[in-house]
From Swiss-Prot:
The lineage of its organism: Bacteria, Fusobacteriati, Fusobacteriota, Fusobacteriia, Fusobacteriales. Belongs to the GHMP kinase family. IspE subfamily. ATP binds at residues 101-111. NCBIfam families: ispE. This is 4-diphosphocytidyl-2-C-methyl-D-erythritol kinase. One of its GO terms (biological process) is isopentenyl diphosphate biosynthetic process, methylerythritol 4-phosphate pathway. It comes from Fusobacterium nucleatum subsp. nucleatum (strain ATCC 25586 / DSM 15643 / BCRC 10681 / CIP 101130 / JCM 8532 / KCTC 2640 / LMG 13131 / VPI 4355). It comes from the Bacteria.
């Protein structure tokens, strides 16, 4: 018989990449990156129940396309935490309600993992300090350490360097996620590896623009290495970008992470009009309005 010990409801938010530089593959098969990641107020919900008896992790998910067995990143998080902490495994149930789209470049899975890892640490008496938790998170996935701090940050290396930056942007963000296709991270990096020339974002300028809250200047400095590769190989992405540029002329659209989500910054005055145009003239996409969490 399962006796419930503690119940928690946690909200694990998404992120956007405000620029992403990817560098040539290292000898270990991985790429170093340089990026500004900013948390946004679009969140998954996790109801987590700890039981008093020993056992394993059980996951239920609202999105039936997401595996709930050992392939789920929450399982990896659970396994690594208990292996490292030497705590006895308790039975834990997670009911996961997905609001962050998959294959979107918004860090949904990494966010779930980061917030679950923080909850495990808290539940067991803060076994690790923040720095130690970031190192543990790195073993789960390269975007997971960012969600330990969960503040706008410059992320470097293979995701292991997370340095906070000041973000004074006041604009809203419109996310555009295609419904009938996504981009796998593997596909994105393979496309990047075949690029002959890469245009890089200037993060010194981006950091200055964020501090000043200067969206116009910021937009002129954003580049995404993975997008440049994907636009060469993925017809769906190429058509989506062309459609966005033609439907809302004069606005700049940026890919987050490895895609397939695009986003644009909007003022309060233009938000409603641009949202309406996108919903009217761009087929098979989900439109989400959000803001960065500063």
């Amino acid at each position: 018989m399962r006796i419930s010990l503690n119940k928690y409801k946690i909200f694990s938010n998404a992120k956007i990449n405000i620029g992403l530089n990817v560098f040539q593959k290292e000898s270990d098969g991985y790429h170093n990156i340089d990026s500004i990641m900013a948390p946004i107020d679009l969140s998954d919900e996790m109801d987590v129940t700890f039981y008093s008896d020993l056992g394993d992790l059980k996951i239920e998910c609202s999105d039936k396309s997401i595996p709930t067995d050992e392939r789920n990143i929450l399982y990896k998080t659970y396994k690594i935490f208990f292996e490292e902490s030497k705590k006895e495994k308790e039975k834990i149930d997670i009911i996961l309600k997905k609001n962050i789209p998959s294959e979107a470049g918004l860090g949904g899975g990494s966010s779930n993992a980061g917030f679950f890892l923080k909850l495990l640490n808290k539940h067991y008496g803060n076994v690790y300090n923040e720095k130690e938790l970031e190192k543990l998170a790195m073993r789960v996935g390269s975007d997971v350490p960012f969600f330990i701090k969960n503040k706008t940050a410059r992320v470097g290396g293979k995701g292991n360097r997370v340095d906070l930056v000041e973000n004074n942007l006041k604009d809203s963000i419109i996310l555009i996620k295609p419904l009938d296709f996504g981009v796998s991270t593997k596909e994105a990096y393979e496309s990047f590896d075949n690029l002959k020339e890469v245009k890089y974002a200037d993060f010194d300028k981006i950091i200055k623009n964020l501090k000043e809250g200067n969206r116009i200047a910021l937009e002129s400095n954003i580049e995404n290495s993975l997008e440049q590769g994907i636009l060469e190989t993925d017809t769906n992405i190429k058509m989506l970008k062309m459609t966005l540029n033609s439907v809302v002329s004069g606005k700049k659209f940026f890919m987050s992470g490895s895609g397939s989500t695009y986003y644009t910054f909007v003022t309060e005055l233009e938000k409603s009009q641009i949202e309406t145009r996108l919903k009217t003239f761009v087929d098979n996409v989900k439109i989400i309005i959000c803001k960065t969490i500063n």
